[in-house]
């Protein structure tokens, strides 16, 4: 998908030898507003294509020479949810479509594509140590779900022991479904991209963040904004309570799982395996945030490091 959107579309109709450095720079312009990770990925793919062509003597000139590896917007810092926020989130969506997805993300740390591709043959509940095997991944093509055994990385293939709260939740879900997918639509099929967005909307509509809506005034469409107060009800749907007064995203649930493991003292190498991180740097960056983000706990260490020597 990345290759199609950012390389094939702008450059796909050209011959390799006709591509200039200006063409490459023009192709990279839309990526300036995207994440630094996506920019780096496209940058790497382009360089792989043209350096390979150069080595095969298909090109006399490599248009990627001098292409900066830095670009895109730096990623926003992701904060793990607190225990209180986790409880509030689960209480708010209990019995609603996103509940199972949220439970799996919070208590097994699976990525979104791993949860949406999860089938019951990879959920082992009736064993002494219940666990989930990650063997498939979901992706969307033209808003159609595609389930593949090709995972994000080799490290993504893993077996994750799950706690009792998630085991009980999955047992209950399994008893009520005939689908082979753990998270499925009403027909038992894996969710499409738009279906998942609708499922997640059950979370966002219960947020106390300002909501925009439109209404007609004197024949004109006017944009209005309402800022709900926690505990208030939606005017047109009294059953809907605005309760979530914090930001929450699907990836944040996985980040919370990893953070909680580190807070519990699980060694980073084990966390790396459970999270499916191929690069230990990803795990260690989170570890550093967890270990070194409380100045009061570091005060004694800093004081000891800079204490005057006995002979001074």
Features from the language model and the residues they span:
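N-terminal core-binding DNA-recognition domain of tyrosine site-specific recombinases/integrases
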Residues: 1-60, 75-77, 189-195, 212-214, ...
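Short, charged hinge/linker segments at domain and secondary-structure junctions
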Residues: 17-22, 51-73, 224-232, 300
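Short, basic (Lys/Arg/His-rich) helix/loop patches that form interaction surfaces
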Residues: 36, 87, 91-96, 108, ...
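Basic, Lys/Arg- and aromatic-enriched nucleic-acid-binding interface segment
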Residues: 36-44, 55-120, 126-128, 155-157, ...
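Conserved tyrosine-mediated DNA breakage-rejoining catalytic core shared by Y-recombinases
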Residues: 68-69, 85, 118-175
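Catalytic-site neighborhood detector that most strongly recognizes the C-terminal catalytic loop/helix
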Residues: 80, 138, 167, 275-300
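Short, polar N-cap/turn motifs at the start of nucleic acid-interacting alpha helices
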Residues: 122-131, 247, 266-286
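C-terminal secondary-structure termini that scaffold catalytic or DNA-interacting sites
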Residues: 127-128, 140-157, 164-166, 187, ...
């Amino acid at each position: 998908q990345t290759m199609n959107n950012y390389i094939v579309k702008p450059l796909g109709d050209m011959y390799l030898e006709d591509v200039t450095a200006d063409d490459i720079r023009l192709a990279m312009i839309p990526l300036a507003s995207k994440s630094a990770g996506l920019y780096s990925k496209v940058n790497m793919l382009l360089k792989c294509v043209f350096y390979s062509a150069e080595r095969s003597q298909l090109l006399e000139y490599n248009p990627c020479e001098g292409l900066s590896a830095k670009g895109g917007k730096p990623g926003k810092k992701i904060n793990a949810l607190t225990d209180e926020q986790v409880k509030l989130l689960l209480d708010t969506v209990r019995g609603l479509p996103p509940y199972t997805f949220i439970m799996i993300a919070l208590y097994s740390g699976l990525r979104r594509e791993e949860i949406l591709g999860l089938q019951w043959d990879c959920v082992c509940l009736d064993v002494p140590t219940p666990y989930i095997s990650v063997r498939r991944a979901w992706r969307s093509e033209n808003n159609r779900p595609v389930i593949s055994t090709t995972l994000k990385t080799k490290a993504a293939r893993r077996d994750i022991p799950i706690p009792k709260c998630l085991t009980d939740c999955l047992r209950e879900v399994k008893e009520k479904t005939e689908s082979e997918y753990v998270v499925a639509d009403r027909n038992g099929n894996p969710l499409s991209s738009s279906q998942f967005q609708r499922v997640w909307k059950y979370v966002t509509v219960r947020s106390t963040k300002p909501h925009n809506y439109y209404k007609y005034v004197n024949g004109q469409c006017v944009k209005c904004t309402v800022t709900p107060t926690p505990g208030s009800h939606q005017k047109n749907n009294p059953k809907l309570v605005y309760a979530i007064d914090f930001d929450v995203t699907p990836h944040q649930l996985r980040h919370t799982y990893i953070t909680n493991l580190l807070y519990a003292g699980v060694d980073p190498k084990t966390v790396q395996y459970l999270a499916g991180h191929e690069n230990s740097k990803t795990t260690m960056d989170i570890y550093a945030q967890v270990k070194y983000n409380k100045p009061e706990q570091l005060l004694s260490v800093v004081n000891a490091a800079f204490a005057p020597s006995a002979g001074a």
